[in-house]
């Protein structure tokens, strides 16, 4: 199928059909049809003479019913001129599709005799194949489209089960949807459940994320009706995130996944659409855009994997029958950057493969500019061995797939044994124009030259006729042969005088049984290009039809003795016309049928059984993992049982076992050899000593979910500059770079597998595979002398680097400065970037345009390092052109969603300002809150921005030991900031006591300075710890435990179990940590946090701290142990280890039940001072590493590391079971995080469910699990879903009030910033938290609407006014109800009229302020108190044509949840009018302070 977007053009394509040759009987009949535009998408309906093509310019479609002799335009309905693409059904010879423009399409079910139109409310997707076909039911098709509104586009997938008679929406926002049964062979030989025929797989975004690394693979057997689909259990039944796409090949369905922080892919395979297994490639890495699934056999997959990223070469692999284990066939295959591989299986003959390989691969690997020398190789045994192609005694090399010049297969066709190609003899392949046409009629064993020069070629009548056309320039002749290319005749094309064409396509019907061919070519006439479609018919050249004596029994494969060879248990023969027979077969539409003779079984008929892999010598099959003996068979290690030999007969192999090998015969196995070794039941310890006294730093190169292997790699640099590496988490260490002076190690910022080891000279080494191999590189200059990193890394391109080096800094008299260079191949070649820079950085592409080359640099003004002005400049073309954003900056920071710049003022005493960009192109000045009292803004700390908002710490007091500042939070585009929390502590280095909880969005903790007034007078700081569960909108104190770990009460009391200023839990935070990696929480242990601190009024010194734990994300805490401990999480929180901090010890404490109970373990005979405890960053390992020194009696000198291995512990020796369909059926349960101030359990407007291991289950989690299971109910909006708007600040009772003397942002800006906007809303003091998904409920930010200029008509349609009787009832009924309810409330209410307390929640009964009978009437009650003024205002407001609006409930349950921030904005039509004078009605000028509210909300 060829898909091309076509341009509309005037004029008709078909001009003439007048040139026909009237040849005598010794030549073919040739008919020429002239076209004005280039024909494209030409195809035959299989087993017919019906051919179709598409106008390459004006969107017309043509059909020929006589193999191209006569063409007619398809003029059905509105099809003429509307075709976008034309394609046949790949598995149904009667069906084809014309995909049109504007959602109109056509289908034929009778080879273009009739057409039926169908429509879809979407355009065709430019990112995916438009049609996806079912492998066994041609009426089942999916259409992948896209629906756009302005610049907002949503991908939509539709399906039909009746050949497009009806069409249904399958899902929105799904990509790469595929039928489970995608090929005719899928499931053959298996007893698949009936529902698999309906099963569809789709790639969808993550539940909380749009990043590709969070994509999920969902499937449904009900077309995604009534459910959101089930997540496919790709890895041992567990879901895997980061699914890129799916693909099908014969009997297999494949899914490729990529984890965050690696470009290594994992390939998962299934042959039944239920059980998936990870494919193993004999130790070879598979990387993104670095593998190609090739034409596979009926019994194996063949995949070419890129072997070197510096040039296009690969390794060919072949799988076993279930696609799980791959073995190498041949190295250094030739491929191109588009993923095409020089590989072809010879059609109709099993086991013969033609490939091209790179002869000078070593030179090519060293330099990408070295030209490849390509040689051809052929295999006759399914890729086990390869040999050169031979033309006589010379090696022959042929052009293949990477530079194919024709449709379809390159070398072969269904004509048995006939193979052709363009190439040359000699040492390697030359240019195409230097090639000749070669042919083999024995399936590639022997070759001979057929014609000089390059030709296109095609086979007909099962090989009786071969046609060739000159392909190095223009021609007006064709060549043909009736004797397998031994001799050739020529025929002239009946073209106009002096016209010669350049051949574009030469083709025939797919089965090569016809005597008719179609040639497409173009000729230049003056300034125009003319196009011709030429029908060539040999049917009348021979009258005789072949009979038996004209045929031979031809063996498809021969062995080295030139005898018929066996493959898949049989010999293959064809009844083939003899080369010199003077006849035509004339069996059009009848494919050649092979005959088979069975063979006795040999070793080649067997493959490794499931759970076995080939041994290193390839002669036997050894267990890939521990075997399971039959139940009850192994009671003692010395027992024996009968089990698999390790081999099995390849499925589909027809060999005869009698008299042959029976490698699959069960054998006797010893239980001690094959049983899984029982857990020793103990923790294992490995201690290692080093000569250095201490370590300078260490870091992990951690495997990701898609990484192969089982290493846990740690790299350490000691205080003596020695570099050590351990691949087994510190059990064994190896020194590296002993002869080199490594001065710095720079792990790749974005890819876990990569690290760079640098010297002061500019030479260095790097690893791409977590320390398994190291390669050397040379930088253009020594590292810079600005104490800044020499390397800057690209977020998406692993091999793109920027090197900032020092020039003229060797005392030569020049001006020392920094120069930046870039490379796209890890330093193999460097290119100049910028001079006189301080630093340069790549900018992440996502949501910031389409260019990978966006680079930001800080450059000194006028390239003068003495200048005090540092400019921020950017470029998208390596600074061929540049853009200056700011002329005088202090620094800039790149974050996941924003680029934030600190800008200096004109004078030294001026405050800093902030600039923000989300696309790297346009910057806006950040609007900082005026209620942050900062005399001069001198320092900012950029925190994080993973929740669609940026957090900044703005320093208020910068005096040493008295530093603190305000925590401010942005809106979704980073430009408008509001105060989140005052007086947040920071240290002299600029670090703030602020930390977000890992694994759970919106939860963060901060330490505040509680005695600000005293600190301003010089007093020491006193701290309190605060927590937020709605991303900084509301903060509360930490609730203290009821009792300590020894059961004693604390010396202070709470109020109703809630914290007070005098009694709360306070924890030591970021600024007091020796290692900032020691965080409260873990990405794997969702909901758990550990910290050291105390209960009381303030945080006390660390020396008196105890250790506390929470298991519900900070809502409740308990004391884990008395004293201060260092902690680390393992196995995603199923193991927690505590080690005393600052106290010598021989023992550690560990918990297997999330800290509910603790056990002591002695890890050393000598007391040690433990400096740190570590594990892999994801906290998924069962290994821990202690770093310290022996200090007790009998101590050894030097640094010691102690590996603590829990994998042998009996309680952690069995893998936990997670069933995605029934997530709570086995070892896991679903945990819902909650908001402490919301009784309904909602957090960010929804209820999310996370997988957590049941604490009582004795098993281990293993590799990182996908914790987030689902997002359940969407909640109504409450106060917790809003934060204070710009220039508003929170009050003690939780409401938001405008800062006195300041104005809100101009709300009308939405009209100018968004041309599609219809309305704007008056400021209310509230704005939605960007992370919330809430729907309905309190719409605190959208109450009073007004039309945008010149949008009054659209506004009126959106908000129709009440008229007539409707208006009367709108006035009278509310007043009557208000009077009645108001009177009742007046008798029962507590007298606090005129007070709106938006921060309060709870179920306070019938007359609670959130009660539906009170929350609205109370505003009117407030008006009744002043009825003389309020009522006229109410009445008059109803007559205003542009009044404000309040929400009117719709159909309720039919609504869909908001899927994005834009989705909420799009529902502004759900509101109708109320009064403009609402503030006066609500009495908001009379709000009072409330001590009770202060204590309840914990607001500071």
From Swiss-Prot:
BNR repeat placement: 378-387, 438-449, 480-490, 724-734, 821-831, 1108-1118, 1150-1159
InterPro entries found in the cross-reference section: Sialidase_sf (IPR036278), Sortilin_C (IPR031777), Sortilin_N (IPR031778), VPS10 (IPR006581), VPS10-sortilin (IPR050310), WD40/YVTN_repeat-like_dom_sf (IPR015943)
Residues that span the membrane, as ranges: 1365-1385, 1413-1433
Superkingdom of the organism of origin: Eukaryota
Subcellular location: Golgi apparatus, trans-Golgi network membrane; Prevacuolar compartment membrane
Primary location class: Golgi
Ranges facing Lumenal side: 23-1364, 1434-1500
Membrane topology: Multi-pass membrane protein
Gene: VPS10
Protein name as it appears in the record: Vacuolar protein sorting/targeting protein 10
């Amino acid at each position: 199928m060829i898909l091309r977007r076509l341009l509309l053009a005037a004029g008709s394509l078909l001009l003439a059909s007048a040139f026909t040759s009237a040849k005598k009987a010794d030549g073919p009949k040739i008919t020429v049809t002239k076209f004005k535009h280039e024909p494209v998408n030409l195809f035959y309906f299989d087993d017919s003479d019906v051919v179709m093509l598409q106008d390459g310019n004006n969107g017309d479609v043509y059909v020929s019913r006589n193999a191209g002799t006569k063409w007619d335009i398809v003029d059905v309905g509105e099809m003429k001129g509307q075709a976008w693409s034309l394609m046949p059904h790949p598995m149904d010879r009667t069906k084809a599709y014309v995909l049109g423009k504007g959602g109109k399409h056509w289908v034929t079910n009778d080879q273009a005799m009739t057409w039926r139109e169908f429509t879809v409310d979407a355009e065709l997707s430019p990112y995916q194949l438009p049609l996806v076909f079912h492998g066994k039911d041609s009426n089942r098709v999916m259409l992948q489209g896209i629906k756009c509104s302005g610049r907002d586009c949503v991908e939509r997938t539709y399906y039909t089960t009746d050949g497009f008679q009806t069409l249904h929406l399958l899902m929105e926002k799904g990509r790469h949807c595929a039928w489970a049964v995608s090929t005719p062979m899928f499931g053959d030989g298996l007893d698949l459940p009936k529902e698999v025929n309906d099963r569809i797989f789709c790639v969808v975004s993550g539940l909380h994320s749009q990043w590709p690394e969070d994509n999920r693979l969902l499937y449904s057997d009900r077309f995604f009706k009534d459910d959101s689909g089930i997540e496919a259990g790709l890895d041992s039944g567990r879901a895997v995130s980061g699914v890129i796409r799916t693909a099908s090949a014969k009997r297999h369905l494949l899914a490729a996944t990529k984890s965050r922080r690696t470009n290594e892919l994992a390939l998962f395979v299934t042959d039944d659409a239920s059980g998936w297994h990870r494919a193993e490639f004999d130790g070879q890495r598979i990387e993104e855009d670095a593998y190609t699934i090739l034409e596979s056999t009926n019994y194996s997959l063949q995949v070419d994997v890129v072997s070197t990223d510096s040039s296009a070469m690969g390794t060919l692999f072949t799988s076993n029958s279930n696609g799980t284990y791959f073995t190498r066939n041949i190295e250094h295959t030739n491929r191109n950057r588009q993923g095409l591989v020089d590989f072809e299986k010879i059609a109709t003959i099993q086991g013969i493969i033609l490939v091209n390989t790179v002869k000078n691969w070593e030179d090519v690997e060293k330099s990408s500019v070295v030209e490849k020398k390509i040689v051809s190789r052929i295999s006759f045994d399914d890729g086990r061995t390869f040999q050169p192609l031979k033309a006589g005694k010379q090696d022959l090399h042929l052009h293949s797939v990477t530079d194919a010049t024709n449709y379809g297969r390159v070398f072969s066709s269904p004509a048995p044994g006939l193979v052709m190609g363009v190439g040359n003899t000699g040492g390697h392949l030359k240019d195409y124009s230097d090639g000749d046409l070669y042919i083999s009629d024995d399936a590639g064993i022997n070759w001979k030259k057929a014609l000089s020069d390059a030709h296109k070629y095609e086979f007909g009548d099962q090989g009786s006729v071969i046609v060739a056309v000159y392909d190095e320039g223009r021609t007006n002749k064709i060549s043909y042969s009736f004797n397998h290319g031994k001799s050739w005749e020529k025929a002239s094309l009946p073209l106009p005088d002096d016209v010669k064409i350049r051949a574009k396509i030469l083709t025939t019907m797919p089965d090569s049984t016809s005597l008719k061919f179609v040639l497409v070519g173009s000729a230049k006439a003056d300034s125009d290009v003319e196009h011709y479609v030429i029908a060539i018919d040999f049917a009348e050249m021979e009258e005789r039809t072949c009979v038996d004596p004209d045929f031979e029994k031809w063996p498809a494969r021969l062995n080295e003795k030139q005898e018929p060879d066996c493959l898949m248990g049989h010999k293959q023969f064809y009844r083939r016309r003899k080369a010199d027979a003077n006849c035509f077969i004339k069996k059009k539409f009848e494919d050649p049928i092979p005959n088979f003779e069975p063979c006795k079984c040999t070793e080649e008929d067997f493959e490794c059984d499931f759970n076995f892999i080939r041994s290193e010598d390839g002669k036997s099959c050894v267990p890939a993992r521990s075997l399971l003996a039959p139940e009850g068979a192994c009671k003692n290690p010395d027992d024996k049982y009968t089990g698999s030999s390790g081999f099995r007969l390849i499925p589909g192999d027809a060999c005869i076992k009698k008299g042959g090998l029976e490698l699959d015969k069960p054998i006797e196995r010893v239980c001690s050899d094959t049983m899984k070794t029982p857990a020793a039941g103990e923790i294992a310890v490995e201690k290692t000593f080093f000569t250095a006294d201490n370590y300078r730093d260490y870091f992990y190169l951690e495997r990701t979910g898609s990484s192969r292997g089982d290493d846990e790699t740690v790299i350490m640099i000691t205080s003596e500059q020695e570099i050590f590496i351990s691949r087994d988490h510190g059990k064994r260490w190896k020194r590296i770079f002993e002869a080199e002076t490594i001065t710095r190690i720079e792990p790749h910022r974005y890819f876990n597998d990569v690290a760079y080891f640098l010297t002061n000279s500019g030479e260095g080494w790097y690893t791409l595979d977590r320390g398994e191999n190291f390669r050397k590189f040379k930088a253009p200059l020594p590292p810079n002398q600005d104490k800044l990193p020499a390397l800057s890394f690209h977020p998406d391109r692993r091999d793109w680097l920027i090197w900032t080096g020092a020039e003229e800094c060797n005392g030569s008299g020049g001006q020392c400065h920094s120069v930046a260079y870039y490379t796209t191949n890890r330093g193999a070649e460097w290119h100049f970037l910028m001079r006189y820079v301080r630093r340069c950085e790549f900018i992440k592409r996502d949501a910031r345009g389409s260019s990978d080359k966006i680079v930001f640099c800080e450059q000194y003004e006028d390239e003068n390092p003495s200048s005090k002005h540092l400019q921020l400049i950017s470029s998208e073309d390596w600074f061929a052109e540049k853009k200056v954003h700011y002329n005088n900056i202090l620094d800039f920071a790149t974050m996941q969603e924003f680029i934030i710049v600190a800008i200096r003022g004109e004078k030294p005493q001026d405050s800093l300002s902030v600039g923000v960009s989300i696309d790297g192109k346009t910057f806006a000045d950040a609007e900082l809150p005026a209620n942050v009292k900062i005399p001069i803004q001198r320092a900012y700390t950029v925190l994080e921005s993973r929740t669609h908002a940026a957090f900044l710490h703005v320093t208020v007091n910068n005096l040493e030991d008295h530093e603190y500042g305000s925590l401010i939070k942005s809106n979704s585009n980073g430009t408008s900031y509001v105060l989140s929390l005052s007086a947040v502590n920071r240290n002299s280095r600029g670090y703030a006591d602020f930390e977000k909880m890992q694994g759970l969005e919106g939860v963060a903790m901060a330490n505040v300075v509680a005695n600000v007034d005293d600190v301003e007078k010089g007093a020491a700081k006193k701290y309190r710890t605060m927590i937020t569960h709605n991303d900084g909108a509301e903060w509360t104190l930490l609730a203290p435990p009821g009792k300590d770990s020894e059961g004693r009460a604390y010396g202070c009391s709470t109020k109703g179990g809630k914290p007070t200023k005098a009694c709360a839990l306070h924890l030591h935070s970021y600024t007091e940590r020796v290692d900032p990696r020691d965080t409260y929480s873990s990405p794997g242990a969702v909901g758990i946090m550990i910290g050291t601190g105390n209960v009381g009024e303030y945080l006390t010194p660390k020396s008196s701290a105890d250790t506390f734990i929470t298991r519900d994300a900070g809502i409740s805490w308990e004391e884990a142990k008395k004293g201060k401990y260092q902690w680390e999480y393992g196995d995603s929180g199923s193991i927690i280890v505590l080690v005393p901090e600052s106290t010598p010890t021989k023992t550690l404490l560990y918990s297997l039940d999330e800290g509910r109970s603790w056990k002591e373990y002695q890890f050393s005979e000598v007391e040690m001072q433990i400096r740190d405890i570590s594990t892999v960053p994801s906290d998924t390992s069962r290994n821990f590493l202690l770093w310290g020194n022996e200090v007790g009696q009998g101590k050894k000198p030097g640094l010691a590391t102690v590996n603590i291995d829990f994998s042998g512990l009996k309680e952690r020796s069995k893998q936990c079971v997670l069933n995605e369909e029934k997530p709570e059926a086995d070892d896991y349960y679903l945990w819902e995080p909650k908001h402490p101030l919301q009784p309904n359990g909602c957090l960010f407007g929804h209820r999310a469910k996370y997988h957590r291991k049941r604490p009582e289950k004795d098993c281990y989690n293993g590799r990182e699990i996908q914790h987030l299971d689902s997002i359940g109910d969407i909640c109504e909006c409450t106060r917790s879903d809003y934060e204070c708007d710009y220039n508003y600040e929170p009050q003690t009772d939780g409401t938001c009030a405008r800062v006195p003397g300041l104005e809100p942002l101009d709300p009308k800006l939405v009209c100018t910033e968004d041309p599609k906007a219809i309305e704007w809303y008056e400021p209310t003091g509230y704005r939605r938290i960007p992370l919330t998904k809430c729907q309905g409920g309190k719409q605190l930010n959208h109450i009073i609407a007004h039309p945008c200029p010149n949008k009054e008509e659209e506004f009126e349609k959106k908000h129709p006014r009440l008229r007539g009787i409707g208006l009367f009832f709108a006035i009278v009924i509310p007043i009557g109800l208000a009077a009645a309810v108001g009177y009742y409330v007046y008798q029962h209410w507590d007298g606090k009229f005129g007070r709106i307390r938006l921060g309060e929640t709870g179920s306070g009964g019938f007359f609670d302020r959130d009660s539906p009978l009170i929350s609205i009437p109370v505003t009117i009650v407030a008006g009744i108190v002043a009825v003389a003024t309020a009522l006229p205002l109410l009445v008059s407001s109803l007559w205003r044509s542009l009044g404000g609006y309040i929400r009117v409930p719709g159909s309720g349950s039919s609504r869909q949840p908001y899927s994005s921030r834009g989705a909420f904005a799009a529902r502004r039509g759900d509101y109708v009018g109320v009064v403009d004078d609402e503030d006066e009605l609500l009495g908001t000028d009379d709000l009072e302070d409330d001590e009770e509210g202060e204590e309840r909300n914990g607001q500071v």
